[in-house]
A protein has these predicted regions:
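Active-site hotspot residues in diverse enzymes, especially metal/ion-binding acidic/histidine motifs
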Residues: 1-235
């Protein structure tokens, strides 16, 4: 079973790796820059990030490899691809290569990197999990929730969207939500600003929304009908 780690614990762990990343690339927290998860994975963690077709239906977003093993995927036309993976391989489904999938691709890389971080830090806990599960950990689009996957998702979010970086982006975008209400409408300039923040950080709309809710910048779910929309289009 995975070790118990709170969100605060995972934030602390992420901070150490972000510090290493910033030091390696000469970035200052006084002028923070978004974290490129592929550079973090390769340069800081020593992982090998690859893009290959992993499935024909989009169900597998990525996987991380702990021990040498073979992997077979059957494509939509029936073609079988057989790959040999090595420890420290992180493989992302090639369907995520397009620019429109940047947020999902980045989060998947960070998620798989998080599995390696946790396995390295807590081998007695995660080593047992690996032996029970096999040699590979998958990130599935609609996978069953588990404690280990929650930790990997949370650590991934902390790596990509640390509080200091999000706060800097809030200031840069002049985001102002004094009552915490966000309208998911082009009539609300804050909605466009948050979309711009997501693009700059390299995450999806849903990822930045959840992060802003956790930071209590947004309260509750975004409201779809802006008052100006009612005036323009009626109820």
């Amino acid at each position: 079973m995975a070790r118990y780690l709170s969100r605060a614990d995972l934030s602390h762990i992420a901070g150490k790796y972000i510090d290493q990343y910033y030091t390696r690339f000469g970035i200052s927290k006084d002028d923070p820059e978004p974290i490129d998860p592929e550079r973090l994975a390769s340069s800081v963690l020593g992982l090998n990030v690859k893009m290959l077709p992993l499935c024909s239906d989009g169900s597998i977003l990525g996987l991380t490899v702990f021990q040498r093993c073979g992997f077979t995927v059957t494509l939509g036309d029936g073609t079988k691809l057989v790959e040999m993976f090595m420890p420290k391989d992180v493989v992302i489904d090639s369907a995520l290569a397009s620019d429109s999938c940047t947020g999902c691709r980045n989060f998947t890389i960070a998620h798989e990197a998080a599995h390696h971080i946790l396995a390295d830090l807590f081998p007695n806990d995660y080593g047992k999990a690996v032996k029970c599960r096999g040699h590979i950990a998958y990130r599935e689009r609609n996978g069953q929730p588990s404690w280990e996957e929650w930790q990997a998702n949370t650590l991934a979010a902390e790596l990509l969207m640390p509080t200091f970086l999000v706060n800097a982006e809030i200031e840069r975008a002049a985001l102002c939500l004094p009552n915490g209400i966000l309208y998911k409408s082009a009539s609300d300039p804050n909605y466009e600003r948050i979309l711009e923040m997501a693009a700059r950080i390299g995450v999806s709309w849903s990822a930045i929304r959840i992060r802003l809710q956790q930071m209590q910048v947004i309260n509750g779910k975004p409201i779809h009908c802006h008052p100006l929309d009612v005036i323009r289009f009626g109820e």
